[in-house]
């Protein structure tokens, strides 16, 4: 039985947004060690190399939970590890972050290209735009966006752009289909970055995976952290006793 739950953060915002969720998961799952794993330095590394690096860094047979880009990396790592992964949970994480001809329920290419260009020209302005999008759909978006911006950790522009390129590159459709362990994928109903319309297509990738709507915004794991912690705990406890 796994003794660890690892949380992977999203692009640009660092580990702080996951801290409250981690504390609540600690309380809900006292039998597990909950740790937040910062994303690795993505500069100059392929997606395959990053997955291999995370495989070396993280405990074997742990539960993996990731937010947005962290969820995409967790999904790829779960498929890489297979039976050496206890289970997978993602929040606001699309199999393809950027739309493709065969995956339209994602961010349009033109929108992503314009955002990447903004970050290349003025990273601070790009982060401000990003936190506004993360907060869109929340009951109180302005305080939430200020909270996110205050602790954002995008690194330098080279690192930030490399992270965006990774978001555009990753395609986890095959990973979701191939991973045989427990999977819970949660999409926010009014997410401005990962459209909830992806839900039905995600369900078609793996009939054994659980794909649900949870929360309202891309940053819903902050404002609804207690409910999310309980949903995750219920899923893990069922998986451990299956």
Regions found by a protein language model. Give the residues of each.
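Catalytic histidine-centered segment of alpha/beta-hydrolase-like enzymes
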Residues: 216-229
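Conserved alpha/beta-hydrolase catalytic His-Asp/Glu region
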Residues: 121-170, 175
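Gly/Ala-rich beta-loop-alpha elbow adjacent to hydrolase catalytic centers
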Residues: 66-70, 74
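Conserved alpha/beta-hydrolase "acid-adjacent" motif
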Residues: 192-198
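The conserved beta1-alpha1 loop
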Residues: 8-11, 67, 187-188
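Short beta-strand/loop motif that positions the catalytic acidic residue
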Residues: 179, 185-187, 191
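Conserved HGGG/HGGXW glycine-rich cap/lid loop of the alpha/beta-hydrolase fold
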Residues: 1-47
